[in-house]
Amino acid sequence: MASKEILFDTKAREKLSRGVDKLANAVKVTLGPKGRNVVIEKSFGSPVITKDGVSVAKEIELEDKFENMGAQMVKEVASKTSDIAGDGTTTATILAQAIYREGVKLVAAGRNPMAIKRGVDKAVESLVRELGNLAKPTRDQKEIAQVGTISANSDSTIGNIIAEAMSKVGKEGVITVEEAKGLETTLEVVEGMQFDRGYLSPYFVTDPEKMVCELDEPFILCNEKKISTMKDMLPVLEQVAKMQRPLVIIAEDVDGEALATLVVNKLRGALQVVAIKAPGFGERRKAMLQDIAVLTGGQVVSEDMGIKLENISVADLGTAKRVVIDKENTTIVDGAGKGDDIKARVKQIRAQIEETTSDYDREKLQERLAKLVGGVAVIHVGAATETEMKEKKDRVEDALNATRAAVEEGIVPGGGTALVRVAKVLDDIKPADDDETAGVNIIRRAIEEPLRQIASNAGFEGSIVVERVREGKDGFGFNAATGEYEDLIGVGVIDPKKVTRIALQNAASVASLLLTTECAIAEKPEPKKDMPMPGGMGGMGGMGGMY
């Protein structure tokens, strides 16, 4: 086992502090509308240019083990804020640096770090409560677009596309970001339920040019097991044929005699039919078939529920206004399911989302929820080069997360103003002793830091800007994009309250942990051994006279 190096007290905190500063200083140049870019070398491919705080933080590894520990702790602030709120990573990093920097001085001067931590926690709790009072719910599409624009570094095209996507699929709809083939950034909305399974045979297509199968007012049969023989299906097929309506069969698989018979009937024109594999696998497949059945007002043919294929009638089938199937996807538009049944199913999925601990399961449940309630929107991001594409895609994803957060918890004045505006509640805190008071004062100074940095990045004197904003009321603040002092909510400079709250809580949490650190342990770097002298080459004798 390699030997360890141990640092105590001031020396440990000094090294950690140096690491915190190195990471935070690299990240904070990106803050605000006039924030600068950071260029990151990649071991392969072109360098990445970004203004995304968490992307910068993730790239930083320091040579000194102790400094690196400090940097990694602050990196966690950025990552955690990004995971929960999706934005606000730079703000969180700046707050963590400011809290730790102020706290280290006080601990070095003999203050009790545990009491300081208690003061910090009390201050953060009060500020979070006051942020809730300051927040206003998002009223319309315009405000959602403004949040998206601010988060995408003042790119109004991105803000407007996200607002349009949200208005079309609802706040619980799925919005995904993909790379476009061209230069334009566009929005594509898939209405109804779509899943990634296509027709089992190309003979089912109704439009040979487009190679798609479009059916109007079809019956929809959901079957949990594989269908290989025809005899089980004959009763229901005869009933559907009599009514002269199309039929969509969704099953684990359809093969052999069953598939051949369906294809022959389709080609002869006896029955307009299409067979599709059910989406998903295992338990998820069962759940998705049940979703389709609820959406279309049908029953899942399942032995678990005591329903057999040979016993079903047309009454057990679902229906929809239209079903479109291509080689890879199926879209069910306007299913005929009862509103109450769909609501009950949605409630059940929401409960599962709350309970699950797996990120993957949560994502899949949210997709199912979106397919039931709204639909799916895809933002195709266009750019001229691969480097620009990566940078733009990052900004779109940030903006998308910020708008979701705004819809969830409301909006507050942007540009670092909200934290300055709620600082007055810190006067009402009753600390137990002087050390707790010091903790409250650390937060009082730290929450001004994001505004100071935004002003500094825009070429203004931070202290003067902070003083002027502190004198104002409500939404009055500094618009760094124009250099004006104005009502920020009125001109659309707004932040999601959730992003501001999460950034503050995460920053205070990690900075407090660092402050109460008394000892740091890291592996000793191994001394570099000198390269041995190369040995003489044998057999070189008798070669004199060579020049």
From Swiss-Prot:
GO terms for molecular function: ATP binding; ATP-dependent protein folding chaperone; isomerase activity; unfolded protein binding. Keywords: ATP-binding, Chaperone, Cytoplasm, Isomerase, Nucleotide-binding. One of its GO terms (biological process) is protein refolding. It holds the Pfam family Cpn60_TCP1. Together with its co-chaperonin GroES, plays an essential role in assisting protein folding. The GroEL-GroES system forms a nano-cage that allows encapsulation of the non-native substrate proteins and provides a physical environment optimized to promote and accelerate protein folding. Forms a cylinder of 14 subunits composed of two heptameric rings stacked back-to-back. Interacts with the co-chaperonin GroES. PANTHER family: 60 KDA HEAT SHOCK PROTEIN, MITOCHONDRIAL. This is Chaperonin GroEL. It comes from Nitratidesulfovibrio vulgaris (strain ATCC 29579 / DSM 644 / CCUG 34227 / NCIMB 8303 / VKM B-1760 / Hildenborough) (Desulfovibrio vulgaris).
